[in-house]
């Protein structure tokens, strides 16, 4: 008689292996049907389009989950060094189509949905963007997660699950109005709550120094609930995890304070604790210094570090014996990348855990911390640097303040020993800034506490070394690196521009999707008549499609054979949307002056959000919409010039406008844009760039040849020279009649007849205190735009330059960026190993 199975033997039947994946169209249909009825509890008589979207999302998710589980099993067995990417922002956009693309499911799903009498594109449009970021910094984090999974790295993204992401922008009477982004209202099919890993985070309280060590007592506790989202690599069966924390009040929250019986009040007050993960702060490149924001920064750091240490100590969930208690090997198993200074508290928090909790001695703990952490700098604008008041730390994080003081003291002792008597250097390099309000300089803390510090484009990394962190570079030059940003070609070509991707695949195969340098193989085709025609045809189709979208969504009719001149990014003075406005007004004046002349027709599209408290940025939006109101309704102009403000610019709108663009505007003042990544997306999608020598534009010009971009304006050294000499806007105003005319029209109310003074603040700024020197680049910009017009009249020559740009965009893949981080900062090697899918036994 067969021996009865033990419980543990029986449990071996609980396996992902026996579960069928989506092999074909019939499987997709079956799974879709099952989810519609059993998961959503709907039939076809009552199902809404949103129900159909959710049924498809669950179908695709089923296919993903087996691979997700397999990947985690693989990491537990191999125990590789793990990469932790800490960011307060992950601007993911939509997930459905990206998941289908990366799993190779798009054709099967498309056909199955068609067979069911539905439209895949319509279902995709129902999904909310996950807008957990402001702009470039958050989108970079999302591209990096895609690349880390595609390169087979054991990587985790850690952030906050904001209940409300970046606000939705409405334009009302030409002004930006913010609306809350309730992106979770209908539920999120991609996330999985993990209450078993919920962790406590402490705030406030007091510090006690005892013979047994330091104790942080009488704290307020907030719980961090993790929500996991799968991040699939491209066709390699690797599925990594993005873990976002949500704040929960503990069950006894405030109840002890209300022993007089105000139970209801205590329960209502739970909201106060849970506000920590309520909303993303909508400031891009601006530091506000709010206590709730500091709480958010510590919340994500404290929860994440507990999680990292749990995973380091014990490889498997449910395994009761800690595998590792010695922290010597911690930096060999853990790399923490700080995405800007927002997660800077990782440094003092790791020190607190090592010294106070794990009883590691200070010097050893400091060595471990430095070897583990690395810091990416994203901005050189002084108003963006985080400088927290010491008084806020004293109250909120008293133990961390002590640790920061101790770190700073040792650091300054070291500097003083190397530069005796140089008191000014000590002041410049201190983490603590003295003054009326003592402040903690978080960037200095990051530089001191990390083994690697990187900028995000070559020119930016030079500015970081020569200016922002000059003293620190002199102290430890080997610490400073450059890692030029990149974008994922899966989302930013294959997903958003399938026509162009197919055209390229026909010529050079599919390898470029995971090795973008292969695009160089297109160079011999620059003069190929058929390829030129094919590329131009794809662009025209994209323009027609986007024109139809604009007509449907914005009720504006545009000329699809006009040049699509696109300027989309956060609205900020340094990005110089005002320079673009002056060009538009000048073009308008030229058409009015000589209506019979042949003009190259243009549709100028400007889009982006302004921080709600940034008066000048909001006024810039009003100016763009006001110029549009005049230009678009002038019968003399006709369809030769149109100005469109693209409302509520976000990832899903970028995916539509970028493939349709002819001209990409990247016109920040030289030395202000750290890198930019929009510039790379336009280049890859067949737009030509008009730009300054700033950020990654410099490297784009180097890769494609400066003659294949439209480069204009002051260089960094010219800007510095002008600063030394003193920038005088009036000189340009007096000597350039077209500039004077445009400024006078804005100033006099020509574009705002009902409110003649509407734009006085803009004109006053431009004339008297313009840090970003708009007038200084006006003449060069106008001349450069004339060259753009001239080339656009010759479609064949234009398309040749487009092909050359696409062929030379390989460097700007986030796969290349992440490979450099892996080898030069994290000390790991990318892997092309295919993890076996769930239906195949593991080795």
Swiss-Prot record:
Residues recorded with modification Phosphotyrosine: 197, 473
Site residues by UniProt (Participates in a stacking interaction with the adenine ring of AMP): 76
UniProt lineage: Eukaryota, Metazoa, Chordata, Craniata, Vertebrata
Protein name: Glycogen phosphorylase, brain form
Entry similarity comment: Belongs to the glycogen phosphorylase family.
Post-translational modification: Phosphorylated. Phosphorylation of Ser-15 converts phosphorylase B (unphosphorylated) to phosphorylase A.
Phosphoserine modified-residue sites: 15
Origin species: Homo sapiens
Assigned EC number: 2.4.1.1
RNA-binding found in the keyword field: no
């Amino acid at each position: 008689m067969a021996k009865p199975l033990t419980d543990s033997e029986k449990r071996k039947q609980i396996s992902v292996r026996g579960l069928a994946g989506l092999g074909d169209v019939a499987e997709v249909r079956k799974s879709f049907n099952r989810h519609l009825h059993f998961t959503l509890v709907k039939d076809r008589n009552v199902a809404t389009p949103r129900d159909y979207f959710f049924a498809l999302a669950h179908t695709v998710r089923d296919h993903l989950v087996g691979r997700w589980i397999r990947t985690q099993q693989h990491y537990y067995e191999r125990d590789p060094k793990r990469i932790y990417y800490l960011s307060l922002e992950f601007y993911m956009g939509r997930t459905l189509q990206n998941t289908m693309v990366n799993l190779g499911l798009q054709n099967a799903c498309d056909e199955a949905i068609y067979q069911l009498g539905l439209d895949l594109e319509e279902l995709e449009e129902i999904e909310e963007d996950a807008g957990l970021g402001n702009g470039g910094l958050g989108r970079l984090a999302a591209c990096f997660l895609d690349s880390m999974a595609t390169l087979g790295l054991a990587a985790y993204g850690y952030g906050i699950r904001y209940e409300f992401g970046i606000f939705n922008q409405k334009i009302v009477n030409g002004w930006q109005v913010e609306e809350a982004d309730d992106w979770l209202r209908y539920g999120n099919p991609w996330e999985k709550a993990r209450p078993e890993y919920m962790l406590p985070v402490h705030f406030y309280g007091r510090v006690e120094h005892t013979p047994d060590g330091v104790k942080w007592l009488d704290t307020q506790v907030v719980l961090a609930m993790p929500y996991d989202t799968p991040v699939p690599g491209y066709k390699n069966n690797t599925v990594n995890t993005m873990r976002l924390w949500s704040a929960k009040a503990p069950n006894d929250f405030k109840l002890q304070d209300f022993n007089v019986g105000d139970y209801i009040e205590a329960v209502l007050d739970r909201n106060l604790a849970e506000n920590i993960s309520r909303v993303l702060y909508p400031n891009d490149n601006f530091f506000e210094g709010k206590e709730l924001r500091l709480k958010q920064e510590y919340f994500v750091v404290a929860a994440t570090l507990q999680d990292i240490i749990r995973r380091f100590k014990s490889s498997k969930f449910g395994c009761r014996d800690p595998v590792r208690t010695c922290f010597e090997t911690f930096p060999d198993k853990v790399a923490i990348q700080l995405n800007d200074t927002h997660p800077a508290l990782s440094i003092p928090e790791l020190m607190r855990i090592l010294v106070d909790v794990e009883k590691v001695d200070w010097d050893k703990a400091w060595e471990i911390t430095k070897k583990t952490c690395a810091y990416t700098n994203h901005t050189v604008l002084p108003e963006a640097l985080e400088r927290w008041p010491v008084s806020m730390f004293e109250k909120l994080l008293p133990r961390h303040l002590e640790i920061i003081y101790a770190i700073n003291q040792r650091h300054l002792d070291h500097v003083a020993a190397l530069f005796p008597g140089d008191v000014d250097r000590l002041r410049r390099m201190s983490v603590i800034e003295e003054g009326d309000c003592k402040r903690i300089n978080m960037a200095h803390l990051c530089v001191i506490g990390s083994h690697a510090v990187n900028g995000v484009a070559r020119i930016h990394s030079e500015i970081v070394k020569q200016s922002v962190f000059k003293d620190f570079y002199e102290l430890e030059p080997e610490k400073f690196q450059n890692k030029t940003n990149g974008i994922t070609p899966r989302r930013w070509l294959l997903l958003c521009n399938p026509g162009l991707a197919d055209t390229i695949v026909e010529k050079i195969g599919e390898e470029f999707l995971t090795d973008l340098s292969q695009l160089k193989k297109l160079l011999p085709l620059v003069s190929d008549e058929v390829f030129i025609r094919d590329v131009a045809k794809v662009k025209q189709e994209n323009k027609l499609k986007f024109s139809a979208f604009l007509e449907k969504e914005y009720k504006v009719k545009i000329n699809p054979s006009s040049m699509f001149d696109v300027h989309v990014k956060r609205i900020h003075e340094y990005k110089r949307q005002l320079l673009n406005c002056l060009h538009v007004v000048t073009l308008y004046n030229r058409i009015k002056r000589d209506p019979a002349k042949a003009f190259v027709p243009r549709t100028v599209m400007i889009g982006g959000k302004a921080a709600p408290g940034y008066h000048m940025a909001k006024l810039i939006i009003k100016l763009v919409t006001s110029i549009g109101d005049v230009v678009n309704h002038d019968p003399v102009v006709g369809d030769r010039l149109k100005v469109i403000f693209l409302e509520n610019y976000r990832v899903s709108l970028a995916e539509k406008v970028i493939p349709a663009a002819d001209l990409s505007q990247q016109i920040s003042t030289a030395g202000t844009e750290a890198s930019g990544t929009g510039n790379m997306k336009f280049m890859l999608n067949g737009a030509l760039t008009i730009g300054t020598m700033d950020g990654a534009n410099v490297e784009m010009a180097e890769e494609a040849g400066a003659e294949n971009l439209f480069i204009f304006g002051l260089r960094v050294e010219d800007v510095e020279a002008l600063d030394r000499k003193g920038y005088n806007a009036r000189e340009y105003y007096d000597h350039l009649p077209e500039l004077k005319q445009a400024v006078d029209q804005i100033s006099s109310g020509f574009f705002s007849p009902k409110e003649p003074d509407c734009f006085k603040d803009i004109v006053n700024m431009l004339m008297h205190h313009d840090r970003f020197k708009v007038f200084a680049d006006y003449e060069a910009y106008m001349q450069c735009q004339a060259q753009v017009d001239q080339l656009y009249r010759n479609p064949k020559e234009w398309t040749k330059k487009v092909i050359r740009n696409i062929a030379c965009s390989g460097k700007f893949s986030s796969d290349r960026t992440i490979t450099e981080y892996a080898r030069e900062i994290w000390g790991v090697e990318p892997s092309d190993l295919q993890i076996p899918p769930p239906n195949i036994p593991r080795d």
